[in-house]
Regions:
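DNA replication initiation on ssDNA origins
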Residues: 1-77, 85, 140, 167, ...
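Short loop/turn segments at strand-loop or loop-helix junctions that form parts
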Residues: 26-27, 83, 98-101
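DNA replication initiation modules
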Residues: 49-50, 58-86, 110-175
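Active-site palm subdomain of RNA-directed nucleic acid polymerases
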Residues: 88-96
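Short, conserved phosphate-binding/catalytic loop or strand-edge motifs used
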Residues: 96-105, 142
Length: 175
């Protein structure tokens, strides 16, 4: 299933037509492959790989071939693994998707870009405040909605993104 147009429009806040999006594929054998695609290629990428691989992407732009912290560019998104925690009612994600039963990932949209060093501070504060999974660096790979989670004996569909698309004022991201 392709990503819905609205969510692709959200992704375009961070990625221009020709910008590279860093992606990853995890095979059941444990072999991991990194690569890049453009936003125009995302539906084809999902269709080609979701049935056989865990499919991930980095939601922050990267300058260069390597997905390293020093190559991260400013982003409009904060992204987090909400595994084992409640979706916060006082600071709900702009969009979230279920990656397996009762486990979610969320994306918060900022009205202004967030510098990589500020992202790290905000992400760690969110982890602490809301008890999110600690894997929260700006270049972390997260599941792509509408793919399949092959981590379990019975594969789980990753849901379509849900949420109202709230755009948070940068100064109100309080974490």
């Amino acid at each position: 299933m392709p990503l819905d147009k609205k969510f692709k429009d959200v992704l375009s806040l961070n990625f221009g037509k020709d910008d590279e999006i860093h992606v990853g594929l995890l095979a059941s054998s444990g072999q991991f492959n990194n690569g890049t695609i453009t936003l125009d290629e995302i539906d084809e990428f999902i269709a080609e790989y979701k049935d056989d691989y865990n499919v991930f992407m980095c939601y922050a732009p990267i300058d260069g071939e390597d997905r390293l912290l020093e190559n991260a560019k400013p982003t409009r998104f904060l992204v987090a693994d909400i595994d084992g925690a409640e979706i916060p009612k006082e600071f709900p994600p702009s969009y979230y998707w279920e990656t397996s039963p009762n486990k979610y990932q969320g994306l918060w949209i900022s009205d202004k870009v967030i510098a990589p060093k500020d992202y790290e501070v905000l992400a760690h504060a969110m982890v602490k405040k809301f008890k999110f999974d600690s894997a929260s660096d700006i270049v972390h790979l997260y599941r792509i909605p509408t793919t399949i989670n092959h981590k379990y004996a019975t594969p789980q569909e990753v849901s379509e993104p849900k949420g109202d698309g709230t755009v948070y004022r940068r100064q109100d991201i309080f974490c």
